[in-house]
């Protein structure tokens, strides 16, 4: 069974990642479907909620915004939403503005709702998953529904450099007059919180042009603009959808039910072959440009035709550029921001090995600025966590080592090696707040487990579950590697004798400290 890592498909398929039931992996379709589309799911899989609700997709942009839900459009996490954006003036977490968009097909007065929602009492309503015939991802997510004689296609694009989602509906086939109704469900909340019906929410809806509306439930949030490009009318029929249930949160032990508000719906007639575009963003747009913008975004996507292309696309999802001179690798979607250690671990794969060396320079330059400020005890930007963690500088050296092994003559070589020397000197001078250098050359981590001092940072009542301290195996393995790499890069004749002496002591000390009688390595030694 083939699998694809859950790193957005940025997460970067442009990235779309398939997340498994444990948030790790998801099976790919049977081999007989790969010639048609590498990532394709049929009615059998999608109509079975036990299966389809385990399959999620994430799409992000360069600004840290994303959309994320299950393949059938049913939100199962409090983090799920169609337009999730950073609003740093409110809180450091992302915020969900548009939770979902429920489509309804109307023929001969009969309504067929294509949405799917779970409720706290176990109810599933509507049951739109029963109408899905196919879901595939080539350059973008595409869902095909069949309702009687109606065949409707839904495609979505999350814009690359804007906080904007565009959803295209195309009537592929119909034997009679067809009406399409689009009902948005809005949240206006932090991704880690849940909302409930209240009297504080401002449920006013304002018209935008002739085919759009804007709304903002709470003070401090930006207006959410929702527009369509077709001749349509907006129906002010707002109400709270109560007791929506997120089973993934229940499994995680968190509150799992909330109320969300739907302000009304758009309604329009569709003819065979006709398309309508729905867009949601933070400002008014010219709806006549939506078809061209949609096509342009699709043209810049790379098709997911095999595992490698999926992973390359996924890597791009994590590239985060909040400002022109600040470049990062996000630690993960949907809940993590920028974490220094994770960034340095992931940087080689997200740049060097995905054929984007320029990304390495951009991210490493930002990281080096932050690291030097940390060494100088200058206040650090709030958008990067964990710069003081004990092995962050060593992972950065490892990333530089891998980069220079691929690009040995790069113009940045001298700049990077100067930084490597500066980090090594920082550790040797005992200025790191957690680590100290021992006479045997090993690094020793101080700490009581409050807070945790390593990447194993789970806590109960403020205490580390695994209170690692002392000689840490990965820290000292990276430390030995850093020194040896620096000696090789500088050349033995230019290598300081002091560092050569540390290497001579460190090698034997590592073996004596960490290798146990059975040939395994101790995790840490106090």
Role assignments for model-derived ranges:
Residues 146, 244-252, 313-327, 366-376, ...:
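Active-site-adjacent bridging/hinge elements
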Residues 296-333, 362:
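Conserved oxyanion/phosphate-binding beta-strand-loop segments in alpha/beta enzyme cores
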Residues 154, 261-267, 326-344, 380-393, ...:
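Solvent-exposed loop and edge beta-strand segments that line ligand/cofactor-binding
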Residues 2-303, 307, 334, 341, ...:
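Terminal accessory carbohydrate-recognition/targeting modules of carbohydrate-active enzymes
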Residues 314-318, 349-353, 363-370, 426, ...:
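Generic, well-ordered alpha-helical scaffold segments in large soluble proteins
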Residues 173-174, 195-198, 270-272, 337, ...:
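Aromatic-rich carbohydrate-recognition surfaces in CAZymes
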Residues 309, 428, 435-439, 469-471, ...:
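Catalytic cores of carbohydrate-active enzymes
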Residues 180, 413-414, 492-496:
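Short conserved catalytic/interaction loops centered on acidic-Pro-aromatic/His motifs
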